[in-house]
C-alpha cells in the first residue's frame, strides 16, 4: 500500500507535505482532487521529457488499473481507496469485487441475477462475505452430550449452516444427510439478513453473534415457527421420522425408547438457540495408516454417531463428534496402539470368542508388565540399561499396507478365494453383537486398542481392551471385548472447505478442549 501511494505521488513525499501546509486554508473537495492530480503530474515529471514508461499508476489506463486492483486481496482495497480520488472512483467498478468474491469465496453468480436483486458484488463482498468470514468452516454445537457437526459454507449468494446427520441406523455405508439450520443473505442493498431454518413454517428472523475467536452463537427470534399444530406429540413423531428414520411403532425396546425421548426433550429446550465452537479436519501425513477424517459408526442402542479419526505418531485416536448420555461428544472413544499389531488366527479359531479374547488380553498383560518394569526402574533410581531392558517396542514397520491398490485391497469375498498376502480373512466371534451384519469379511491389519465405556451421565468412565480392525481405506471396526460388541465405521465422503487447522498445535489444543466442552 505504501508503494502504491509513492507511485501515485501522494505518499510521504512532497505531495503530502504540500497538502499538510494547506490544511489551514479550508477543505474544498474539488480543489483537493485537482491538487492531487497536479501533485502526481509534477512528481511524474510532466514538464520534463516524456518518459519511456509511466512513473505513476495514475497515468495508466483505467482498464489496466481495474485489472491490477482486482488481483489484490479484498481486505487491502479499502485502504487503497483512501490513496486518491481516482483510485476511489475505480474501486467502484463491480468487476473488481466480482473477481474477489469468486477467488476468495468461490461465488460464481451471474451479474444479471445480482442486478435483479439490486445488490452489487461490492455489497456481497463487504456486507456478507467479509462480515461473516469468521463463521465459515466446521463447528460443533453445544447440545449437552449429543454434540453435532455443522458446516458453514458460501452457497451462491447465501451463507448457509448445514447440520450433518448420520444415515439411518444401521446403514453406516450410506451417505450423510444435511439439514439447514440458518442462512444469511442480502436484501435490496440492506444489511445482511440472518434467518433461522428450524421447523416447517419457512425461514424466519434470527441473530448471529460472534462471541469470541472460534466461537459464535445463534438466537431464533420467532420460536413460534418451530411449533406444530399437533403439539409436542406431533413434533416428536416428525423429529423421529426425519432425524432417526423411525416411527414409534418401530421401537420395541424400552431402554431405546427412553434414550430417544430423552434426546428429543434435550434438543427441544434449545429451540435452535445454540453456541458453536470451531473444530478442524485432522491433519494427514504420508505415513498414516489410512487417511484421517470423519467417519460414522454404530454404537448399539445409541444408533449411528459421527467420529473423527486422527493420528499422533504411533497412536491413532477416534474422537466423538456426536455423542450420547454415556460417552458424550468430544470424548476419545477409541485409542489404537499402532506398535501392537495382532495377527488373527484362521477363521475357525476366530469364531471362538475365547480365542480372540486371549489374543487381546495377552497384549494387555504384556503392556502391564512393561509398565511395571518401567515404574520399578524409576523407583530404584536407575535407568534401563541396554543389557537388562527388554527390546523397545517398535512401530509397525509399514503403517500403510504394502501393494495397496484399488483392486486387490478391498476383497470382501468368501474365504475360499485366494487373497493378497496383506489381506486376512475376518469374521466376528460368536456372541459378539453387531448392529450391521453386512461388515467386510476380510481385513488388512489389526491392532490392540482400548475403548471408553461409562455409565449414564458419563459416570465411572474407564478404558477397556479391544481390537481395532482395518478393513480398507474407508472402513474400520472395533471389537469391545468387555461389552461383546462390534462397531463398524465408514468414511464420510463429504468435502469440507476452510476446515484445516492453522497448525498441528492448534489441532491438538482443539482435541484437548473438546473433552471439557461436554463434561
Curated annotation (Swiss-Prot):
GO terms for molecular function: ubiquitin-like ligase-substrate adaptor activity. Gene3D superfamilies: 1.20.1280.50. Zn(2+) binds at residues 196, 204, 220, 226. InterPro entries: F-box-like_dom_sf (IPR036047), F-box_dom (IPR001810), FBXO31/39 (IPR045048). Residues 54-100 form the F-box domain. GO terms for cellular component: cytoplasm; SCF ubiquitin ligase complex. Residues 369-390 have a biased composition (Basic and acidic residues). CDD domains: F-box_FBXO31. SUPFAM superfamilies: F-box domain. GO terms for biological process: anaphase-promoting complex-dependent catabolic process; cellular response to oxidative stress; DNA damage response; mitotic G1 DNA damage checkpoint signaling; proteasome-mediated ubiquitin-dependent protein catabolic process; protein ubiquitination; SCF-dependent proteasomal ubiquitin-dependent protein catabolic process. Pathway: Protein modification; protein ubiquitination. The keyword Repressor does not apply. Substrate-recognition component of the SCF(FBXO31) protein ligase complex, which specifically mediates the ubiquitination of proteins amidated at their C-terminus in response to oxidative stress, leading to their degradation by the proteasome. Fbxo31 specifically recognizes and binds C-terminal peptides bearing an amide: C-terminal amidation in response to oxidative stress takes place following protein fragmentation. Belongs to the FBXO31 family. Zinc-binding is required for the structure of the protein and facilitate folding. This is F-box only protein 31-A. The lineage of its organism: Eukaryota, Metazoa, Chordata, Craniata, Vertebrata.
Amino acid at each position: 500500500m505504501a508503494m502504491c501511494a509513492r507511485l501515485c505521488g501522494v505518499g510521504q513525499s512532497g505531495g503530502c507535505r504540500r497538502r499538510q501546509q494547506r490544511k489551514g486554508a479550508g477543505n474544498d473537495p474539488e480543489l483537493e482532487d485537482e491538487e492531487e492530480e497536479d501533485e502526481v503530474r509534477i512528481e511524474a515529471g510532466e514538464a520534463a521529457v516524456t518518459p519511456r514508461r509511466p512513473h505513476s499508476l495514475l497515468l495508466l489506463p483505467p482498464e489496466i488499473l481495474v485489472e491490477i486492483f482486482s488481483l489484490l486481496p479484498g481486505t487491502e482495497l479499502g485502504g487503497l481507496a483512501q490513496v486518491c480520488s481516482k483510485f476511489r472512483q475505480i474501486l467502484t467498478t463491480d468487476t473488481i469485487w466480482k473477481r474477489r468474491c469468486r477467488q476468495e469465496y468461490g461465488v460464481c453468480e451471474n451479474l444479471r441475477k445480482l442486478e435483479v436483486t439490486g445488490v452489487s458484488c461490492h455489497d456481497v463482498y463487504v456486507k456478507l462475505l467479509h462480515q461473516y468470514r469468521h463463521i465459515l468452516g466446521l463447528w460443533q454445537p453445544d447440545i449437552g452430550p449429543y454434540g453435532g457437526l455443522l458446516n458453514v459454507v458460501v452457497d451462491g449468494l447465501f451463507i448457509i449452516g448445514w447440520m450433518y446427520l448420520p444415515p439411518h441406523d444401521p446403514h453406516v455405508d450410506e451417505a450423510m444427510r444435511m439439514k439447514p439450520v440458518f442462512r444469511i443473505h442480502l436484501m435490496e442493498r440492506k444489511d445482511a439478513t440472518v434467518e433461522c431454518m428450524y421447523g416447517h413454517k419457512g425461514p424466519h428472523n434470527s441473530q448471529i453473534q460472534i462471541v469470541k475467536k472460534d466461537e459464535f452463537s445463534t438466537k431464533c427470534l420467532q420460536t413460534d415457527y418451530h411449533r406444530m399444530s399437533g403439539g409436542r406429540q406431533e413434533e416428536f413423531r416428525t423429529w423421529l421420522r426425519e432425524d432417526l428414520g423411525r416411527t414409534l411403532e418401530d421401537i420395541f425396546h424400552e431402554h431405546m425408547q427412553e434414550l430417544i425421548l430423552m434426546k428429543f426433550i434435550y434438543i427441544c429446550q434449545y429451540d435452535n438457540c445454540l453456541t458453536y465452537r470451531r473444530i478442524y479436519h485432522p491433519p494427514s501425513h504420508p505415513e498414516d495408516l489410512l487417511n484421517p477424517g470423519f467417519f460414522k459408526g454404530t454404537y448399539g442402542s445409541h444408533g449411528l454417531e459421527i467420529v473423527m479419526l486422527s493420528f499422533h505418531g504411533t497412536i491413532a485416536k477416534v474422537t466423538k463428534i456426536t455423542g450420547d448420555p454415556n460417552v458424550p461428544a468430544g470424548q476419545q472413544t477409541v485409542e489404537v496402539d499402532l506398535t501392537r499389531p495382532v495377527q488373527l488366527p484362521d477363521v475357525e479359531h476366530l469364531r471362538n470368542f475365547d480365542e480372540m479374547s486371549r489374543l487381546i488380553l495377552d497384549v494387555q498383560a504384556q503392556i502391564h508388565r512393561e509398565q511395571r518394569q518401567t515404574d520399578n526402574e524409576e523407583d530404584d533410581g536407575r535407568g534401563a540399561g541396554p543389557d537388562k531392558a527388554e527390546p523397545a517396542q517398535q512401530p509397525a514397520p509399514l503403517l500403510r499396507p504394502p501393494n495397496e491398490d484399488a483392486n486387490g485391497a478391498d476383497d470382501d469375498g468368501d474365504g475360499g478365494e485366494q487373497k493378497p498376502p496383506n489381506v486376512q480373512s475376518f469374521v466376528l466371534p460368536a456372541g459378539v453383537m453387531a448392529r450391521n451384519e453386512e461388515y467386510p469379511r476380510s481385513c488388512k491389519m489389526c491392532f490392540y486398542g482400548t475403548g471408553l465405556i461409562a455409565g449414564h451421565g458419563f459416570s465411572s468412565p474407564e478404558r477397556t481392551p479391544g481390537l481395532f480392525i482395518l478393513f480398507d481405506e474407508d472402513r474400520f471396526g472395533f471389537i469391545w471385548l468387555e461389552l461383546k460388541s462390534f462397531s463398524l465405521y465408514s468414511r464420510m465422503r463429504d468435502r469440507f472447505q476452510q476446515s484445516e487447522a492453522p497448525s498441528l498445535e492448534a489441532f491438538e489444543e482443539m482435541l484437548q478442549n473438546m473433552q471439557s466442552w461436554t463434561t
